[in-house]
From Swiss-Prot:
Keyword DNA-binding carried by entry: no
Organism classification: Bacteria, Pseudomonadati, Pseudomonadota, Gammaproteobacteria, Aeromonadales
Protein localization: Cytoplasm
Protein name: Galactokinase
Native species: Tolumonas auensis (strain DSM 9187 / NBRC 110442 / TA 4)
Alphabetized PROSITE patterns for the sequence: GALACTOKINASE, GHMP_KINASES_ATP
HAMAP family registered for this protein in UniProt: Galactokinase
Site feature Transition state stabilizer, where: 28
Residues annotated to bind ATP: 124-130
Catalytic activity field: alpha-D-galactose + ATP = alpha-D-galactose 1-phosphate + ADP + H(+)
Binding site for Mg(2+): 130, 162
Keywords, comma-separated and alphabetical: ATP-binding, Carbohydrate metabolism, Cytoplasm, Galactose metabolism, Kinase, Magnesium, Metal-binding, Nucleotide-binding, Transferase
Residues involved in substrate binding: 34-37, 223
InterPro entries for this protein: Galactokinase, Galactokinase_bac, Galactokinase_CS, GalKase_N, GHMP_kinase_C_dom, GHMP_kinase_C_sf, GHMP_kinase_N_dom, GHMP_knse_ATP-bd_CS
């Protein structure tokens, strides 16, 4: 049963009628550009064909009624005319409440909706299931009430909900790619200006995401530490963010003993990762998969050695993928670190053999079982 069929059936059961509209918003994978977003840098994600789908019906009053088809049809109801508070027991509700709260704060004219929500973005895998939900809800209100919001406005509203209402300090990348992705393209995003450039992906290219199934500990505290180290390096140079520092300036400061070695390493990752991300957009566009593979390997090594956010099982998984893909693509860890997923780019003809190799070798070397997702670069949010 497709997601659309699922939300349709649950909608009929819950509300006894047909929905007015269906909207969708995808998850994402970041091909390269890690921990650069909060440093005002560049990222190169693509939307994937795992998504959140909403069936909706306009209401004449100010009540929002949501049914979560993936959580045993749990319901949430709240009013647009009362202060929107966090739900004490249902975490999923807060992503929706937060999005609606910040739409209202922008002075937009909303009425209520009946909604059924379902998604197949793997949770806890670093593929942005939460951003997909936030963007889907923003898109639902935008399309139901002709709010005229741009994809960037829907993305920023979702980020605001996650930062302020849910309490997770994410950058803008996840919501932005979910809102504005395009089929068969990656999106080069400047996280400072929010300018985007669509990057055509080669036709004969597969995106393989492998979940390491490493239990992730320390992610939040380590993330905050890395962020603070990057900010202290930017402060030393008197700039807003590491985006404004060159590698030459950084090396000069290090040679003069002006930076702690660990801060130097963290900053070196960010500065070189920005350079790699810009180069990767060009390599992808020209179909130079060998160059793309080199850049992905350099990115992974930098995350391992300078930013110190990989773990041994992830390094092993990347090595297995690199070995079996060869020179026609590459692999690297993607996401915040300390577990999560590896992203690989390879020829479609290689996919089955590479998955078989990963499923044989990774458990033998780590005792962990991988989960593989073969994806296509997909369209961003919209009605369907």
């Amino acid at each position: 049963m497709s997601l659309k069929e699922k939300v349709h059936a649950v909608f009929q059961n819950s509300f006894g009628c047909e929905p007015d509209l269906y909207v969708r918003a995808p998850g994402r994978v970041n091909l390269i550009g890690e921990h650069t977003d909060y440093n005002d840098g560049f990222v190169l994600p693509c939307a994937i064909d795992y998504e959140t789908v909403v069936a909706l019906q306009r209401r004449d009053d100010d009540k929002v009624v949501v049914v979560a088809a993936d959580y045993a049809n749990q319901r949430d109801e709240f009013s647009l005319s009362q202060p929107i508070e966090a739900h004490a027991d249902q975490l999923w509700s807060n992503y929706i409440r937060g999005v609606v709260k910040y739409l209202l704060e922008k002075g937009l004219s909303l009425k209520g909706l009946n909604m059924v929500v379902s998604g197949n973005v793997p949770q806890g895998a670093g593929l942005s299931s939460s951003a997909s939900l936030e963007v889907a809800i923003g898109q639902a209100f935008n399309d139901a009430y002709q709010l005229g919001l741009t994809p960037a406005a829907i993305a920023l509203n979702g980020q605001e909900a996650e930062n302020k209402f849910v309490g997770c300090n994410c950058g803008i990348m996840d919501q932005m790619i979910s809102a504005s992705g395009e089929k068969d393209h990656a999106l080069l995003l400047d996280c400072r200006s929010l300018q985007t450039r669509l990057v055509k992906m080669p036709d004969d290219l597969a995106v393989l995401i492998v979940h390491s199934n490493v239990k992730r500990g320390l992610v939040d505290s380590e993330y905050n530490t890395r962020r603070a180290q990057c900010e202290s390096a930017a402060r030393y140079f008197g700039v807003k963010a590491l985006r404004d520092v060159t590698l030459e300036q950084l090396q000069q400061a290090a040679e003069q003993g002006k930076l702690e070695p660990v801060v130097y390493q963290r900053a070196r990752h960010v500065i070189t990762e920005n350079e790699r991300t810009l180069a990767a957009a060009d390599a992808l566009e020209t179909g130079d998969l060998e160059k793309m593979g080199v850049l992905m390997a350099e990115s992974h090594n930098s995350m391992r050695d300078d930013f110190a956010i990989t773990v041994p099982a992830i390094d092993t998984l990347v090595e297995i993928l690199q070995q079996h893909i060869g020179n026609d693509g590459g692999a690297r860890m993607t996401g915040g670190g300390f577990g999560g997923c590896v992203v690989a780019l390879l020829r479609p003809a290689q996919v089955d053999d590479v998955i078989a190799a990963v499923e044989a070798e990774y458990p033998a070397k780590t005792g962990l079982k991988p989960t593989c997702y073969v994806c296509k670069a997909s369209d961003g949010a919209g009605i369907f």
